Amino acid sequence: MKAGVAQTAVYNDIASNLEKISGYIERAGREGLELLCFPECSLSGYIRDFSRVDPSEVEKALQSVHGLALRNKLNVIVGAPRFEEGKIFNSAILLSADGAKLVYDKNFLTSFDKKYFSPGNEGLAFEVGGVKCGVLICRDQNHPSPSQRYAEQGVKAIFILAAHYYPPPEAWEKLDKNRALPIARAVENNVYVFKANAIGSQGTTISLGGSLIVDPRGLVISEADKVNETILSYKVEVQ
């Protein structure tokens, strides 16, 4: 399975995010990727009032992303709010190359998340190219149990969608922690970890990138810088 993460800027404008996501899907298709993961809330923006987001606009954009994924024979994981029965979830949406649409809802919410979102309580495991994969969102990486459950299910690669937006001093202070956690999850569970983080500013906060791919030994195979958009990719081969 050749998989990758897209480190991108994220805006509070769905049309702008859709244009950016579309460009990276086409690039991933040209590069022969089978799976591409985007940051948390990459379709909607993260630092915003989610009660003002139009669910129909989100759904229309997801349909556009899925159509492009299908044309490029690519599985795509995109971050977006999900609206169900009067609740909003911070979700990772898997838009599969075979036409399926699967959902993971963030389990462990930040104080900001709790203003708008309800927590999920289940994982999401799926297979691409013979490799079983799982999904986490941002704060979920702080807790060992979700990754452990995935490993018990035979997952070999975990994809983390992140949006590490903090006030500037805190953003620098959190760099070491947010790099160490995916490495720890990889080593603890003998899995690959692919982490897609956002870059740039939203409001008075910044996200300093550092997306990365880690192997089961804890070796950082590939790592992005703090300011530039990019795709990181690696071919996972499981015996």
Spell out what each predicted region is.
Residues Q7-D13:
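Short polar catalytic/cofactor-binding loops
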Residues I14, G23-A97, Y165-V191:
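Cys-nucleophile CN-hydrolase/nitrilase-fold catalytic domain and related Cys-dependent amidase chemistry
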Residues S16-R27, Q141-R149:
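Short, acidic/polar
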Residues E59-I77, N142-E229:
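CN hydrolase (nitrilase-like) catalytic-core segments centered on the catalytic cysteine
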Residues V78-A80, S91-L94, L124, S211-I213, ...:
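Short beta-strand scaffold segments in enzyme catalytic cores
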